[in-house]
Structures are given as C-alpha cells and as structure tokens.
Amino acid sequence: MVKVVRNVVCPFCGTLCDDLEILVEDNHIVGTRHACRIGNAKFMHFEGAVRYTEPLMRENKKDDFKKVDYETAIEETARLLTEATLPLIYGWSATECHAHMYGVELAELVGAVIDNTASVUHGPSLLAVQDVGYPVCTLGEVKNRADVIIFWGSNPMHAHPRHMSRYSVFARGFFRERGREDRTLIVVDPRETDTAKLADIHLQVEPHKDYELVSAMRAVLKGFELQVDKVAGVPADLIYEAVEVCKNAQFGELFFAMGVTMTRGKHRNIDNAIQLVIDLNAYTKFGLMPMRGHYNVNGFNQVLTWVTGYPFGVDFSRGYPRYNPGETTANDLLQRGETDMMLNIASDPGAHFPQKAVQHMAKIPLVCIDPHETPTTQLANIIIPPAIAGVEVEGTAYRMDGVPIQLRKVIDPPEGVLPDREILKILIKKVKEML
C-alpha cells in the first residue's frame, strides 16, 4: 500500500521547499508531488546511479576496490588523518548541520584545513558581507511584500526551479495578492536566459562589467547624469528606467548568484551591490540575498562561524583557527600541492575543480564519504557510504536566507548504512585513540 509522507523538505537547492509529498511503498519511494524535476530526481533512484552500501578500500589507486567493514575503513581513515602533515577536509554542502559540528571538531583534532564548496561559489559574497554588511530579510518577506525583484547573474528557472513560483516572482503574498501582476522583474545577465525572457527590464550587461553597471546605477541614484550613451553595454536610458523603478518600489529585493561572485571583481562586485542596496534604503525598503546553490552550503558557513568566527577555509594547523581565503581554501591548497591527504564529504570536487587541483587529488590519499559513485570516488582510496540526509536521516539545514529548517526522514537507509554524523563520531573516537 502506498503511504504519503507530507510536508517533506527537499534536500537539493538552497530554496529548501518544505511542501513536498513523497509516495512510499515497502520502504521504496515510488513518486513525488510538488517537487521540481531536480527535487524529484533527488528522491527517485534512477537506473544507472550506483549506490554504495558497503565501505570500499584499496591501497593503490590503480587497483580494484575491495569490500571492508565500517570499522576497518574508519580506522584506516583515522590513521591517514593523524599521519598527514596538512590534511584537507572539504565538502559539507549536501549534509546536515550535526555532521558539520563533528567535522569542525575533527579538523581541530588533526590540525586540518576545513573548507566547503562556498570557496568556489559564494565565498566572495561572505567576504563582501564582512566588509560592508548584509541588508537581509527572509524569503517569506519577499513573497509577501516585494514588488520589485532583481535577479543579477542568476538564472533561477534552471538553478532554483521553484524559487520564482514559491517565494519571489509568481508567488501570491499577503500584500501581493495578484502575484506576477503586482511585481516588476529586472534581470541583469549577459545572455538572454529563460529567466531574462520573463523580465520587464533586461539589462544585458557585457561579461565582467558588473562593477561598472552597479557604479553607474549608484551614480544615477545620487543624482549624477551619465556622460555616455552606454555603460557596460547597457543603454543609459535603460539604466535610468531601472533605477527609477527601484526608487519607487514599496519593497525591493536583489537576488545575486555566481554570475556576479565568479566574474572579474569577485567580492568587490558584491561590495558595490550591497552599497547600492544601502543607498536605495534612503528612498525605500530594499534587501539583498545570495542564491545559495546546495541545500546546506549556508548551514556549514553558519556552523563554522559559530565555532571559529570564520565562515569557510579555516586552517587549524597551528592549533587555533586561521582564515585567509586564497591561502587556506581547498582549490589553492591542492593547486600548490600543499596538502598531503584529503577527506571529501558530501561534495564532488573531482567533477568541478580545475585540472591541476584534480591531478594533485589523484596523487594523495583520498577518502570519500559519499552515497553514490562520482568522479571523486573514482580517485578515492577509501569510500565510506552514508545514509542520505533529508531522505533516509533527519537533521537541520539552513535555507539561503539563513532560516534553519528541519529535514524529514522519509525511508530507512539500506541495512547497516550509517548517517554522516555517526561515521564522523566514530572517526573522532578513533583519532583520539591514535593521538
């Protein structure tokens, strides 16, 4: 008989939709309701996806994997961590916050560098927030109040498919009962994306010229006249129009994504964008929000900041936390060949890091805590399979606006498979025995 589990939180993207219904039969998920295509794929087990149910180990990366028990795999991982000079513990964005807590404790014990995927996506946003502040609100406020929405360097139609219908553009809110008709949508993007096609105003900025465009908007806002016909490829008239719309908004929200953080200028772009929002607050209410990708990338930044005071890329090699992005971040350590052991959990750097970093990953001992086969597990010496957070085990995740949400358990994990936090607990115990 099919059982319907209601109000399930989707553990895929930073929108963390919490209205899913999952159809379960004999401890198998047979269908989903209300989920987007990506959310549906997270819950449904598709043909071709290789799920690990037992730990695997090999001495040499050219050998085949041999099945071992959890005890052996975790003990060997503990040995590698304690014997390494500078271990790197990376990932964290697709697991829950209790695992993060144990991860930070482990990093402190072994004197490791601990980093998460923010260092290759919204790291610059966090640097900008440290520089100039963070005029923020929740997605609920955006849904109920915002009548001007800006998507800057962001394409939620593909990256966060339910964001527009649930929280921003199409959502019917308390003061915005007509949904889309009550809102003006401005999209800043060099390409005509599916999101840009829906825009009332599309500012087609030239690549790497975001800083110039923000500066021009700030100048216009302060009453200066532009002396040129175009700024960053955008006609001056369109800039005047966009600024006028923002000034006359009752409540505005600027959503920005990796189109701004990973283009030329990095955190200086965000500095300027935050200053634009601060300037706009002289006229009306305006907020800004990073479009966080993985469902709990924000959660790790929160946990690490509570414990160490720094959001990502923290180096414990001297026994106390040090933070210097560019020196203590995963990519830089790997490309310079400074780390001699890597523990990867809940991420896939093998598929996304530059070639030079992946080449170094192939040379050093690599342990993966991952439920499925990925390009990173192909490079690993040890694979430890966990239960999937948000599907087979509950926990806490932080939405893109910093609201913590409780993940639901929908089905039981495969027999004998432990959650991330249990694996890390045992690992900490083994490390303490060896030190």
Swiss-Prot record:
Pathway given in the UniProt record: One-carbon metabolism; methanogenesis from CO(2); 5,10-methenyl-5,6,7,8-tetrahydromethanopterin from CO(2): step 1/3
Coiled coil: none
Function: Catalyzes the reversible oxidation of CO(2) and methanofuran (MFR) to N-formylmethanofuran (CHO-MFR). This enzyme is oxygen-labile.
Subunit structure: This enzyme is composed of six subunits FwdA, FwdC, FwdD, FwdE, FwdF and FwdG.
Enzyme class: oxidoreductase
Organism expressing this protein natively: Methanocaldococcus jannaschii (strain ATCC 43067 / DSM 2661 / JAL-1 / JCM 10045 / NBRC 100440) (Methanococcus jannaschii)
E.C. no: 1.2.7.12
Annotated protein name in UniProt: Tungsten-containing formylmethanofuran dehydrogenase 2 subunit B
Gene symbol of the encoding locus: fwdB
Cofactor: W-bis(molybdopterin guanine dinucleotide)
GO process terms (BP): methanogenesis, from carbon dioxide
Record carries keyword Transport: no
Keyword set includes Oxidoreductase: yes
Catalytic activities: N-formylmethanofuran + 2 oxidized [2Fe-2S]-[ferredoxin] + H2O = methanofuran + 2 reduced [2Fe-2S]-[ferredoxin] + CO2 + H(+)
